[in-house]
């Protein structure tokens, strides 16, 4: 989420129904929402912006290209109706679907346009305030997922093996305060890298190009099991009464957000929660960018907040002295002011 104005926020929908192959009928959208903090009626959607490509900036066939086919593998378009509902009534709009792109992160520029980080390429995609794609998606040289569309339409690309796993693209994108630089964080390690190291690519907005160097985020691999007795609801009952803390395993990132010119926030989380298994690792870290970056150099890293043990001395959350956010995917953080974070 990123702020739209004093009371509303922009939020980005994922690619649809969890999988590429079942998301061809899901429109990609940005929502402007009013959280209405404390209102029992809950948040309201103030505006919906549908992502589309009427100017044909995307150089491969998309779902909403009549006759609604695609050269991308993995989807039988003969199963789609003659006019897929996601494509709307205007074929020229070329509405984008969850089969075309997998948006995972975004930033808003001072001019009101958006840069969206996605995972199929992975690509950075420049989008106007009204949802139009403004220019061809930008990929990192040498970084390709198995779902990269050029693997299907380019003989040269087809001869090159994917270098990052599926669904491990630009999960986090941050923008510098002056709007000149994007920091794009992969969710998975590039082939040949240490699996615990993720690359942060530096993108020059004016030049529309990635820097020759990248930075490295060293992921945590927590080995300590969570104390299940500490995961209690307001009545004292265990939150996960039948769960067993999982062994040490993979950690994912959920968001990257700039604090200032030198510092970033990142969410790291395990893949547990939502009644799967007891979550034991959901944290926000403060990253320190090197003043003289070296190719592959690691960013500094300081623990900032444990989302399974947020101090709650006033009992606002109703869980006692600590509030816990034990959800499987925690995917947004924003620094509202010097003492306040928004986490979603």
Short names for language-model regions:
Residues 1-344:
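Sequence/structural signature of beta-propeller domains
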